[in-house]
Every structure is written in structure tokens, then in C-alpha cells.
Curated annotation (Swiss-Prot):
It comes from Blochmanniella floridana. This is Small ribosomal subunit protein uS12. It holds the Pfam family Ribosom_S12_S23. Keywords: Methylation, Ribonucleoprotein, Ribosomal protein, RNA-binding, rRNA-binding, tRNA-binding. With S4 and S5 plays an important role in translational accuracy. Interacts with and stabilizes bases of the 16S rRNA that are involved in tRNA selection in the A site and with the mRNA backbone. Located at the interface of the 30S and 50S subunits, it traverses the body of the 30S subunit contacting proteins on the other side and probably holding the rRNA structure together. The combined cluster of proteins S8, S12 and S17 appears to hold together the shoulder and platform of the 30S subunit. SUPFAM superfamilies: Nucleic acid-binding proteins. The keyword Ligase does not apply. Belongs to the universal ribosomal protein uS12 family. GO terms for cellular component: small ribosomal subunit. One of its GO terms (biological process) is translation. The modification 3-methylthioaspartic acid is found at residue 89.
Length: 124
């Protein structure tokens, strides 16, 4: 327990909460341009070819983003929107590409959870 005299000498320091998505700079999303689109393998014990892209944001920072869903149309120089959200089995990937925004198309033939993948309602 701290005494009053100890607190007079130096006040309690305020804990600084570190952001898990520093490149967004407190914004919900940020726009960027794809520099490189490639696949990478996840950590053990998982096995796959995860689709990721390197993005240069409007604030000048460069980040790695995960492209969710089955199939994508992203190429170099494509303008995309990114949001926060890490991918647990890909080290260094802390951002997701927003599907269905700017140059990134939504997932084709998606029936459930369409809002997460930028897919319009199917006309029946």
C-alpha cells in the first residue's frame, strides 16, 4: 500500500493502453493501394495457403492484410479498404480487407453471412 507522502512525491502513473491496430490511427477503416498480392502458410499446427496482400495506406504506412472468403480479384495497384482484426495463425497480419468495397469484389455465390463478405441478396 502506498502512503500519502509517497503519492505527494510522485503521483500514480496512468496506464497507457496500446492499440492492436496502430496503422488505422483511431479510424474504423483506412484506404490503401495493394503493393503485392501473395499466399503464405500459417503457423503450426494449421496447414493452408492463406491469401494476403501488402498495402500502402493513405497515411504512408505499409501493412499486411488478410483477404477473407473464397476467391478474390485483387491485383497490384488495386485500391482497397482495410479494417482491423488479426489472423491468429498468420504472424504479423493484423488487418483484414473489406470485401465489396472499392476495387475488391464481394464473394461470389455466398448465401450465409453475406454482410461480412460484401455479397448482395440473391434474386429468387
Amino acid at each position: 500500500m502506498v502512503t500519502i507522502n509517497q503519492l505527494v512525491g510522485n503521483a500514480r502513473s496512468i496506464r497507457v493502453v496500446k492499440s492492436s491496430v496502430p496503422a488505422l490511427e483511431s479510424c474504423p477503416q483506412k484506404r490503401g493501394v495493394c503493393i503485392r498480392v501473395y499466399t503464405t502458410t500459417p503457423k503450426k499446427p494449421n496447414s493452408a495457403l492463406r491469401k494476403v496482400c501488402r498495402v500502402r495506406l493513405t497515411n504512408g504506412l505499409e501493412v499486411t492484410c488478410y483477404i477473407g472468403g473464397e476467391g478474390h480479384n485483387l491485383q497490384e495497384h488495386a485500391s482497397i479498404l482495410i479494417r482491423g482484426g488479426r489472423v491468429k495463425d498468420l504472424p504479423g497480419v493484423r488487418y483484414h480487407v473489406v470485401r465489396g468495397a472499392l476495387d475488391c469484389s464481394g464473394v461470389k455465390d455466398r448465401k450465409n453471412g453475406r454482410s461480412k463478405y460484401g455479397t448482395k441478396k440473391l434474386k429468387s
